[in-house]
Amino acid sequence: MLDQRLVRDNPDLIANELGRRGITLDLTGLQLIAQQQRNLEEQRSSLQAEGNRIGKEVGQRIQQGSDPKASDVAELRQQGNLIKQKVAVLEDEEKQLSARLREQLLSLPNLPSPDCPEGRDENDNQERHRWGKPREGKDLLEHWSIAERLKLFETERSVRIAQSRFVTLMGQGARLERALINFMLDLHTSKGYREVMPPVLVNTASLTGSGQLPKFAEESFRCAEDDLWLTPTAEVPVTSLHRDEIIPAEQLPLRYAAYSPCFRREAGSYGRDTRGLIRLHQFNKVELYWFVHPDHSQAAHAQITADAEAVLQALELPYRVIELCTGDLGFSSSRTYDLEVWLPGAGAFREISSCSICGDFQARRSAIRTKDEKGTRLIHTLNGSGLAVGRTMAALLETGQQSDGSVLLPKALVPYFGNDRLEPE
């Protein structure tokens, strides 16, 4: 959430920065609410000061021997009571305005970083670097064809169980998924991340704090009777792990590696990626999440991206790093690097991780602060997939496919899977 004082006092700056995202917005109404709230604060503060003065004068007169029931003292007390009533009315009006202001601020996305490249959409994103040599060939299969030959997952039966865009992993497929999750968690925890397995059902406050609500309500599955939602990413519960807390600066950074199933309705994606593991309603993911001191967030962004890249390198999967332009940024992000893995069968790069710096945007929504010698201020948060497990499996299948129908696995994964390849049953 944006700083309401910044929106109130610098509306042109906010409008210009949101314009970099391609958003044209009239902030007049929001600015008016913020100014009304400020006026009420000033009136309340003035009345409270007058009330304190009257209370002090009453005390002094009594100390000097005045009868507490004397008319002059009683008149002062009556004035004090009237002021208290006026203050109560102003406080109620402030609360109402504050709720309206927060509702509008929650709908505004984060401001892009000054370092973020300008652009309108994904066509203006900029490639930063590549790793590995992409495998190419005319006869290479896409991952769902390989999975069908190896009987790695059930699609039609999953429709019977749930609906389309669900899969049931079977046999070697289920084993490979489990191996990948354990491998990713072990790799990250060996670098100092603390492992987390959070709830997959989260409340509205958690989704609001991370930035999914109110904008992305249609993208999420909701248990309406219980005010609970299926989490679209572990970023949501991990953000709220420290909601309404003050974290001492000496404890920072806090670095978490969280595994969770993720659930997304994929509204608006009809007809896209209807086969295989690329776009599902339910998928597994290992999420990296940092709480950092505001002075250290830029360096942390480089490191969290490198930690996500390390998974792809260990699995010998060629990829490229793309920096998103201002017009393609996610709602809560101020700067993002996407990792795109090469899929030889598809002959294309596909996103497998987004590593984002959110600044104090999520921290303000979730009231997460830190305290150092300079005082108490909002913390900075960062997140990145480390990695999306299903898409990693798809890349492994297409990269390691052999002419005999087997799939050769990278050496780093062999101890977790128990074999160096997937073989036809």
Swiss-Prot record:
The lineage of its organism: Bacteria, Bacillati, Cyanobacteriota, Cyanophyceae, Synechococcales. It catalyses: tRNA(Ser) + L-serine + ATP = L-seryl-tRNA(Ser) + AMP + diphosphate + H(+); tRNA(Sec) + L-serine + ATP = L-seryl-tRNA(Sec) + AMP + diphosphate + H(+). Gene3D superfamilies: Bira Bifunctional Protein, Domain 2, Serine-tRNA synthetase, tRNA binding domain. Consists of two distinct domains, a catalytic core and a N-terminal extension that is involved in tRNA binding. It holds the Pfam family tRNA-synt_2b. This is Serine--tRNA ligase. Keywords: Aminoacyl-tRNA synthetase, ATP-binding, Cytoplasm, Ligase, Nucleotide-binding, Protein biosynthesis. Catalyzes the attachment of serine to tRNA(Ser). Is also able to aminoacylate tRNA(Sec) with serine, to form the misacylated tRNA L-seryl-tRNA(Sec), which will be further converted into selenocysteinyl-tRNA(Sec). GO terms for cellular component: cytoplasm. Coiled coil: none annotated. Residues 117-134 have a biased composition (Basic and acidic residues). Homodimer. The tRNA molecule binds across the dimer. Pathway: Aminoacyl-tRNA biosynthesis; selenocysteinyl-tRNA(Sec) biosynthesis; L-seryl-tRNA(Sec) from L-serine and tRNA(Sec): step 1/1. Belongs to the class-II aminoacyl-tRNA synthetase family. Type-1 seryl-tRNA synthetase subfamily.
